[in-house]
C-alpha cells in the first residue's frame, strides 16, 4: 500500500500566509465580521490579459496551485478540488445580468465560469493536465472529501502525483444574505473571545489552499498524510468515540498525538463539540486558526496548512495556541486535525511529521 506525502503547499488567506512568512506577520483582526483574503501579485503568475477574465477564486486557485507544484517539483496526474460555494462572484454576476436584461441577450461567459468545477478546470487547462479532474461540494467537509479521494487513489497505486486544494470566495449579495440570516456575527458582538464565545454567528473568511501530494518521499516533504475520516452528524457526547475509534484504526492512542489543530471558531453553537474534543487532550498543545483566517466551507484546508507549517517550526506560534501554557512533551510526530460546523460534517485528518 503506497504512502501519501505532502511535498508542496501554498495558502492564500486573510493572513499573509502566501508570503511564506509563517507566522511572523500574522495578526488578529478581531473587530471585522468579514475577513478578506490578502491576494498575491497575480501578474507574477498569470498573463495580464487572462487576469481580466478570471474571478477571484480562479485567480487565487491558479496561483496557489502553481506555487504548491513548484515547491514539490512535480507535474500532477490528477486534480481534486473541494469548494463549498464555487465561483460565487460569477454566479451573482450572471443572475444579475439575467434579471437586468429580462432574460434576453445574455452572454454565456459568466454562466460558464460560475460552475463549481471552474477552478479545477482552469488549473488543468493551464497545466495541460488531461488526467482525472474532480470537484467536491460537500459543505464543511468538501476539502476532506477531495483529500479522501486522493488517499484512496494513492493506496491503490493508481496515481503517484496529485494536486488537491480547497477554495471559497466572498460575494456581495451572498454575504448580505448571510448577514440577514444571522450566519455572520453581528459586529456589535466583536471582539469575541474564541475560547468562550458569547454569541452565535461566524466571522466569514475566504481563501485558497493547495497541496502537491506524491507517493514518494523527497527533500521537499513536509508531512505524510496517514488517514482521513468524515462523519456527517455527531452529538458532543459522541466526539470521544469518533476520535478514539479513528486513532485505533491507525494503531494509535490519544496519548500518541503530539499536536492538535482544532477548527474552533467564535460561534457559540460550536463550543460544546470543540470543548468535548479538547478534553481528550488535557496536556497536548492545541492550535487554532479560524480567529485569524475566518470560517468558510473549506477553512479546514487552511488548518492543514497550519499543521504542516507549525510542526516544522522551531517553536509553536503563540498567536495560534488555544492554551499558551502547553508545550510539546517531546518532538512532534503525530498531528491530529478536527473540524465541524453546527454539529454536522465532522472530519478528522491524521498527519505524521517527516
Task: Please provide the spans of the model-predicted regions.
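Conserved "HGTGT" condensation-loop signature of ketosynthase/thiolase-family condensing enzymes
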Residues: 1-132, 144-148, 152-156, 167-354
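Catalytic nucleophile serine of serine hydrolases
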Residues: 140-142
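Short, well-structured beta-strand segments enriched in hydrophobic/aromatic residues
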Residues: 161-167
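Short catalytic-loop micro-motif centered on adjacent basic/acidic residues
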Residues: 133-137
Amino acid at each position: 500500500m503506497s504512502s501519501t506525502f505532502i511535498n508542496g503547499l501554498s495558502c492564500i488567506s486573510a493572513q499573509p500566509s502566501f508570503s511564506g512568512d509563517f507566522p511572523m506577520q500574522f495578526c488578529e483582526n478581531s473587530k471585522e465580521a468579514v475577513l478578506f483574503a490578502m491576494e498575491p501579485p497575480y501578474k507574477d503568475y498569470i498573463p495580464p490579459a487572462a487576469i481580466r477574465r478570471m474571478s477571484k477564486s480562479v485567480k487565487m486557485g491558479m496561483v496557489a496551485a502553481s506555487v504548491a507544484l513548484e515547491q514539490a517539483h512535480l507535474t500532477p496526474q490528477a486534480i481534486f478540488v473541494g469548494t463549498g460555494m464555487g465561483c460565487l462572484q460569477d454566479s451573482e454576476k450572471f443572475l444579475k445580468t439575467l434579471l437586468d436584461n429580462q432574460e434576453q441577450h445574455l452572454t454565456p461567459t459568466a454562466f460558464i465560469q460560475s460552475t463549481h468545477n471552474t477552478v479545477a478546470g482552469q488549473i488543468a487547462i493551464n497545466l495541460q493536465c488531461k488526467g482525472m479532474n474532480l470537484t467536491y461540494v460537500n459543505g464543511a467537509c468538501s476539502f476532506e472529501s477531495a483529500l479522501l479521494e486522493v488517499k484512496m487513489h494513492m493506496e491503490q497505486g493508481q496515481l503517484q502525483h496529485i494536486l488537491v486544494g480547497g477554495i471559497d470566495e466572498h460575494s456581495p449579495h451572498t454575504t448580505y444574505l448571510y448577514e440577514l440570516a444571522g450566519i455572520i456575527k453581528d459586529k456589535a458582538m466583536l471582539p469575541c473571545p474564541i475560547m468562550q464565545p458569547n454569541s452565535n454567528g461566524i466571522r466569514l473568511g475566504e481563501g485558497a489552499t493547495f497541496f502537491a501530494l506524491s507517493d514518494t518521499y523527497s527533500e521537499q516533504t513536509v508531512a505524510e498524510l496517514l488517514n482521513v475520516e468524515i462523519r456527517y452528524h455527531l452529538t458532543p457526547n459522541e466526539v470521544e468515540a469518533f476520535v478514539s475509534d479513528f486513532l485505533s484504526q491507525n494503531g494509535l492512542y490519544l496519548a500518541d498525538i503530539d499536536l492538535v489543530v482544532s477548527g474552533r471558531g467564535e460561534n457559540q453553537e460550536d463550543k460544546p463539540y470543540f470543548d468535548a474534543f479538547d478534553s481528550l487532550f488535557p496536556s497536548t498543545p492545541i492550535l487554532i486558526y479560524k480567529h485569524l483566517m475566518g470560517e468558510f466551507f473549506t477553512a479546514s484546508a487552511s488548518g492543514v496548512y497550519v499543521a504542516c507549517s507549525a510542526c516544522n517550526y522551531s517553536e509553536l506560534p503563540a498567536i495560534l495556541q488555544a492554551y499558551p501554557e502547553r508545550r510539546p512533551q517531546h518532538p512532534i510526530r503525530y498531528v491530529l486535525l478536527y473540524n465541524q460546523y453546527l454539529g454536522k460534517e465532522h472530519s478528522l485528518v491524521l498527519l505524521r511529521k517527516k
